[in-house]
Amino acid sequence: DIPCARGLTEDEVNTAYEANTGGVIVEEFRRRGLDPGAFPGVLVQRHGPFTWGKSADASVENALILEEIAKMASRTERIAGERPIGIESYLLNKHYLRKHGANAYYGQKK
């Protein structure tokens, strides 16, 4: 069972987005009484995966495994007729503007 943290509220996105993303991950692990060492990854609603490991290679391997499991789960839901969850404009804008906006601060520098 892969931990799945809730999505961020509009206020959480607009104030300390990165810290609040970490906060919902911690919140989910505490809520479920999970040991982060036993679960080397988590999904955050409307976000990519977060993974970790004893090395960078282990973290990448965990990310690949998590992505495959998520793909299988998504395909299963679609086959079953479940409706995919949309993304709110405030979150979509945050992801785009923090990387590509006038005041971009996240991602690789050119």
Describe the residue ranges of each PLM region.
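Glycine-rich flexible loops
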Residues: 1-110
